[in-house]
Amino acid sequence: SSLVCDTQTLPIRKLFSYGGYVEGWAYYTERISYEYAAQVLAEAEGSLGSSYPAALLCTLLAQQRDLQINLFCLLDLSLHYYGAEKSELLRSLESFGLSEEQSERVYDYLRTAPAVYLKYYVGYLEMNALKKRAELQWSDNFSLLRFHRFVLEAGPSDFENLTKRLKQTAAKTG
């Protein structure tokens, strides 16, 4: 639920599902949590005179998560759009180090939940594009706090309407 969902949102909006917004925001915040953790750990480790191994680990974990999400998106498209066979997908998963049992579980999940990972990644890309628009439109008035507040106060929505709302916000302040 958004910060203003109960008081300022048209009731009809509560009937719609905005998977791209919800999962995109979730993945966006997951990614910045890795960045914040790496920054804090680098500062702490720097004061100890070490070479930042924990900060590097955070960066590697973020990249591993990116690879996982991207791989699952590609496999989802391969299965549901291009019609790839189960054996092809299992072979791909196993080539990335998953066991046969893990590969079967991932395959079953992808088969029964089409486009689930696309909501995460495409929503994340849209969230980043929206942030870049906010940086350009708000210029010196941009801050992550302001952007995050804008997204949360807008509440679940499609990205076209979020972009329109962003332009209205920029017009009011600019």
Residue ranges and their predicted role:
Residues 1-174:
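N-terminal maturation segment of proteins
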